[in-house]
Amino acid sequence: MPLLDSFKVDHTRMYAPAVRVAKTMTTPKGDTITVFDLRFCVPNKEILPEKGIHTLEHLFAGFMRDHLNGNGVEIIDISPMGCRTGFYMSLIGTPSEQQVADTWLASMQDVLTVQDQSKIPELNEYQCGTYLMHSLAEAQQIAQNVLARKVAVNKNEELTLDEGLLNA
């Protein structure tokens, strides 16, 4: 099985919260797709709570689109990582890491303005696979943490995993 790009970076050297360009690719029609690693937690030291990450998934996707879409950028998807340390964001375009970081901070501020769990989008059994597994309080605590710590940039050239550690 081929080694995925996300497993070629040294997770012991990642900062969090931090933005990283995980991958770029060009479609046959010439559009650039960029995948960002939005790392909320330091790998193997912190983890996002399951209800909080789920609620954040519902809120974050809309807020990020509100702030970032336009001027040649369109978000395709924002999905939580299986390890629960962050999200992957795939988009058409090439916004800078700083632009993404600023958008992320603005989105976290938006999360704090949600006043009631009933205001979480798509929070019903028809649109959500585990609609009872939510916590606005946990999502807002995650947002507070990001705002307090700010968002750094993780550079791939600083995180390249030593070949000797592959499959260690």
Swiss-Prot record:
The record ties this protein, via NCBIfam families, to: PRK02260.1-2
Q: What is this protein called?
A: S-ribosylhomocysteine lyase
EC category? lyase
Q: Fill in the subunit field for this protein.
A: Homodimer.
The entry lists its GO molecular-function terms as: iron ion binding; S-ribosylhomocysteine lyase activity
In which domain of life is the source organism classified? Answer: Bacteria
Family annotation (InterPro entries):
LuxS_sf, Metalloenz_LuxS/M16, S-ribosylhomocysteinase
Tell me yes or no: is Iron among this UniProt entry's keywords.
yes
HAMAP family the UniProt entry points to: LuxS
E.C. designation(s): 4.4.1.21
Describe its function.
Involved in the synthesis of autoinducer 2 (AI-2) which is secreted by bacteria and is used to communicate both the cell density and the metabolic potential of the environment. The regulation of gene expression in response to changes in cell density is called quorum sensing. Catalyzes the transformation of S-ribosylhomocysteine (RHC) to homocysteine (HC) and 4,5-dihydroxy-2,3-pentadione (DPD).
Q: Which residues bind Fe cation?
A: 54, 58, 128
The record describes how the cofactor is bound as:
Binds 1 Fe cation per subunit.
* Cited Pfam families: LuxS
Q: Please write the reaction equations for the catalytic activity of this protein.
A: S-(5-deoxy-D-ribos-5-yl)-L-homocysteine = (S)-4,5-dihydroxypentane-2,3-dione + L-homocysteine
Q: Which PANTHER family match?
A: S-RIBOSYLHOMOCYSTEINE LYASE
Q: State its cofactor.
A: Fe cation
What does the similarity note say? Belongs to the LuxS family.
GO BP terms: namely: quorum sensing
Annotated transmembrane regions? none
Sorted UniProt keywords: Autoinducer synthesis, Iron, Lyase, Metal-binding, Quorum sensing
